[in-house]
From Swiss-Prot:
This is NADH-ubiquinone oxidoreductase chain 5. Its EC number is 7.1.1.2. It comes from Rousettus amplexicaudatus. GO terms for cellular component: mitochondrial inner membrane. It is found in: Mitochondrion inner membrane. Its main location: mitochondrion. InterPro entries: NADH_DH_su5_C, NADHpl_OxRdtase_5_subgr, ND/Mrp_TM, NU5C-like, Proton_antipo_N. It comes from the Eukaryota. Pfam families: NADH5_C, Proton_antipo_M, Proton_antipo_N. It catalyses: a ubiquinone + NADH + 5 H(+)(in) = a ubiquinol + NAD(+) + 4 H(+)(out). Core subunit of respiratory chain NADH dehydrogenase (Complex I) which is composed of 45 different subunits.
Length: 605
């Protein structure tokens, strides 16, 4: 009992430390960013204690002691669920946020509103903690909307840029589509079960849950950038690099997958929803991997790799391995945040240059960043004994031994091999070869605020997967036996991707530039999806509206139906009842002929 009580108190302390940091320290002081970063680091260190206690004892805790309100028969209370998912994800999110905040002090040092930027990052962290620990749908929805509005503010941080404003609006609008599904699910649970508490929902175990789970899947599709609602994720790269690292590594984008993992007691008995998740995740992971192959913006390549990994997590939930998907969330956070920070280091060093075609040869001038970027890329591809290997290898093994849907699983394996291709492309273009940037650029990475956060994430990218997978037992039963060739598939697929990428890069190095093929255009223009959705569809609807307004209303009704029809009717009526036909030329001609004949006759007489 004492162990559980101390664990609970420490967990609550973690949640309150960032809030105390934002409230008790003067917001206008120059030292505010340092204070916030220090508080988050303390919160991370404190969070390790209850996590270790939980690992040793395995006791879940639920705190529900503050009553909010009672609406007819529904009682709403503030309740926290400190279980496997929240206790493991909290230290991961706090450690990544700590590193990103320290990196932001270097990256955003010249920004006049850096204090406000840190305030936004802190609020984002608080809402994410609320989402992770929520025990009822209403509280979870508050955290869900909180991360949504904070992402809007952070993506549109450089509000003087049109692209940043458009990207922020795009993010909020696509997420609103997903929120409709969340609200439908909340309404269904309230109407049918009269509760929003997760334990009660899982205990009641309703039978026909297709509608609420489809709503939750739509919500996850919007938040986790699955196919159809994915364009906001690459567009969100218009925000500062620390924002990209925080939102698109460990926190906001995985919230949708986390929601589905939370509801796994309902999804594991619903084969329809599992198949939908599997197919949606497979399409997402392949499509975004293809899009990443031909991008030239270094941040967009990393963003598409995030979307591809989210598709892989969705596939994992779809084959009924939610705890494996959660493990991939935790491992993915470290190396993906590090990849973004390395990209930020390169971009900042090259005077805001993001095009990989204008980089090259950086392994000499940025040796530490090069080491971290290569390690992160190898971890992303699932290189053995790096962090990504411990989750990705298990996922591919589970896919190979699953009999759910061979088509979806096959294209997921293709997407996994493409991961190695675009990772090799970043290394090849940005770090190796000859420098392709101006010689006057001053590069200096010997700055503690830059080195230390990447160093911590580098350690996490190497060892975190080992520690997490060794200390946590899988609660979803894994495949116990499999043939040797299936066991080695994950490594073989990755190696195949590396070999293909290196061969293609070497073979095409000295080729003449040819007009791009349709396949390259399809990949480079993101499958024409933004063009169709953001340009063609609005243009078609606007042109249709214009035609209806001008042709149907103005021309047909206001012009043809009334004034012109009246004038035509009057003309026809007057022509019909009048003896004069209005042929004035004929009248003049007959008059002239008559006059001429009369004159001739007078002359002869």
């Amino acid at each position: 009992m004492n162990l559980r009580t101390s664990s609970t108190l420490l967990s609550l302390l973690i949640l309150t430390v960032p809030i105390m940091a934002s409230n008790f320290y003067p917001y206008t002081k120059k030292s505010y960013p340092i204070y916030v970063k220090t508080m988050v680091s303390y919160a991370f260190l404190v969070s390790l204690i209850p996590t270790m206690i939980f690992i040793q004892s395995g006791q879940e805790t639920m705190i529900s002691n503050w009553h909010w309100m009672t609406i007819q028969t529904l009682k709403l209370s503030l309740s926290f669920k400190l279980d496997y998912f929240s206790m493991i994800l909290m230290p991961v999110a706090l450690s990544v946020t700590w590193s990103i905040m320290e990196f932001s002090m270097w990256y955003m040092h010249s920004d006049p509103y850096i204090n406000r930027f840190f305030k936004y990052l802190l609020l984002f962290l608080i809402t994410m903690m609320l989402l992770v620990t929520a025990n009822n749908l209403f509280q979870l929805f508050i955290g869900w909307e909180g991360v949504g509005i904070m992402s809007f503010l952070l993506i549109g941080w450089w509000y003087g840029r049109t692209d940043a404003n458009t990207a922020a609006l795009q993010a909020i609008l696509y997420n609103r589509i997903g929120d409709v599904g969340f609200l439908v699910a909340m309404a269904w649970f309230l109407f049918n079960l009269n509760t929003w508490e997760l334990q009660q929902i899982f205990t009641l175990n309703p039978t026909n849950t297709n509608l609420p789970l489809t709503g939750l899947l739509l919500a996850a599709t919007g938040k986790s950038a699955q196919f159809g609602l994915h364009p906001w994720l690459p567009s969100a790269m218009e925000g500062p690099t620390p924002v990209s690292a925080l939102l698109h590594s460990s926190t906001m984008v995985v919230a949708g997958i986390f929601l589905l993992i939370r509801f796994y007691p309902l999804t594991e008995s619903n084969k329809t929803i599992q198949t939908m998740m599997l197919c949606l995740g497979a399409i997402t992971t392949l499509f975004t991997a293809i899009c990443a192959l031909t991008q030239n913006d270094i941040k967009k390549i990393v963003a598409f790799s995030t979307s591809s990994q989210l598709g892989l997590m969705m596939v994992t939930v779809g084959i009924n391995q939610p705890h494996l998907a959660f493990l991939h969330i935790c491992t993915h956070a470290f190396f993906k945040a590090m990849l973004f920070l390395c990209s930020g280091s390169i971009i900042h060093s090259l005077n805001d240059e993001q095009d990989i075609r204008k980089m090259g040869g950086l392994y000499k001038s940025l040796p530490f960043t090069t080491t971290a970027l290569i390690t992160g890329s190898l971890a992303l591809t699932g290189m053995p004994f790096l962090t990504g290997f411990y989750s990705k290898d298990l996922i591919i093994e589970s896919i190979n031994t699953s009999y759910t849907n061979a088509w979806a699983l096959f294209i997921t394996l293709i997407a996994t091999s493409l991961t190695a291709v675009y990772s090799t492309r970043i290394i090849y273009f940005a770090l190796l070869g000859q420098p392709r940037f101006p010689t006057l650029i001053l590069i200096n990475e010997d700055i503690p605020l830059l080195i230390n956060p990447i160093k911590r994430l580098l350690v996490g990218s190497i060892f975190a997967g080992f520690f997490i997978s060794n200390n946590i037992t899988p609660t979803t039963i894994p495949q116990m036996t499999m043939p040797t060739y299936l066991k080695t598939t994950a490594m073989l697929v990755t190696l195949l991707g590396f070999i293909v990428a290196l061969e293609l890069n070497t073979a095409t190095q000295n080729l003449k530039l040819t007009p791009p093929s349709n396949y390259l255009k399809f990949s480079n223009l993101l499958g024409y999806f933004p063009t169709i959705m953001h340009r063609l569809q609005p243009l078609t609807s606007l042109l249709t509206s214009q035609k209806v307004a001008s042709m149907l209303l103005d021309l047909a009704w206001l012009e043809n139906a009334l004034p012109k029809s009246i004038s035509i009717f009057q003309m026809k009526t007057s022509t019909l009842i009048s003896s004069q036909k209005g042929q004035i030329k004929l009248y003049f001609l007959s008059f002239l002929i008559t006059l001429t004949l009369s004159l001739i006759m007078l002359n002869f007489t």
